[in-house]
A protein has these predicted regions:
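Phosphate/NTP-binding elements of NTP-utilizing enzymes
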Residues: 1-164
Length: 164
């Protein structure tokens, strides 16, 4: 399935790397989120993870990620039970865009609120990590999600020195 019809060589290298933890120090607008969405949809369709927890620096980036995921869902003709916005914690105003597959797996796209990751498990994707309001707190909240061996992905452009 992975070929140069859909991906550039550096994107294929990212997909072929099966490491549990991957960090992508990247440039802007190179299709990193696009290729990550492909990996995440495949992981859910194939039940390699129970859930994907994706966080980007702002809500528009989370929406763009979900749009990419929707494209891959249609491409694979995957059966989806629900998709839309859900409230994770109304007291803390934490919402997520969610795609729920028929097999029970889910993709969640959240804003950069670190509290959104508390008590969650599964694959974690931190997009534009260096641009989150509080990357240290986000890391502390997200890291335990991978305790049971699920993957962690960090993708980011630079935001000054010592930002990654």
């Amino acid at each position: 399935m992975m070929n140069d019809k859909y991906f550039l060589p550096y994107q294929l290298r990212w997909l072929k790397d099966k490491s549990k933890i991957k960090i992508w120090e990247k440039s802007r607008r190179i299709g990193a989120t696009y290729v990550q969405s492909f990996e995440d949809v495949q992981d859910c369709i194939n039940k390699r993870v129970p859930a994907v927890w994706f966080s980007s620096a702002d809500e528009s980036a989370a929406k763009e990620y979900i749009d990419y995921c929707e494209q891959w869902v249609k491409f694979f003709h995957a059966i989806v039970m629900n998709w839309g916005e859900v409230v994770i914690d109304s007291d803390k105003d934490i919402k997520a865009l969610v795609i729920e597959f028929k097999n029970g797996t889910k993709i969640h796209a959240l804003s950069s609120n670190p509290k959104g990751f508390r008590s969650k498990g599964g694959k974690v994707v931190l997009d534009e990590f260096a641009f989150h309001n509080n990357p240290e707190e986000l890391w502390k909240a997200a890291r335990p999600c991978i305790t049971w061996g699920y993957p962690l992905r960090i993708l980011s452009t630079h935001n000054g020195q010592n930002c990654l």
